[in-house]
Amino acid sequence: MELAYITIRFESPEEQKFVEENISNLTVYEHETWPEDSGYMSWTEFDISGCEPHDVQEPLDEVMEMWENRE
């Protein structure tokens, strides 16, 4: 089976942590977290091997909406 990954860049380490903890069907393959004042953007690679596009996009949309609507 061929490996496949998607890389997502985040505006803050808090956003990155929230997404990693709340996306249930994707596995974190690798990530890098930078301090907010460093000027770098944090990123996470998710393993999407064997996933159909909707298996990736729909959960990502849901968790990003949760992030935007948090209190």
Where in this protein do the model-derived segments appear?
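Short, surface-exposed ligand-recognition loops at beta-strand->loop->(often short) alpha-helix junctions
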Residues: 6-15
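Short intrinsically disordered terminal tails
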Residues: 1-3, 65-71
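Acidic, low-complexity, intrinsically disordered interaction modules
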Residues: 16, 20-64
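A general secondary-structure signal for short beta-strands and their flanking turns/coil
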Residues: 1-5, 41-43
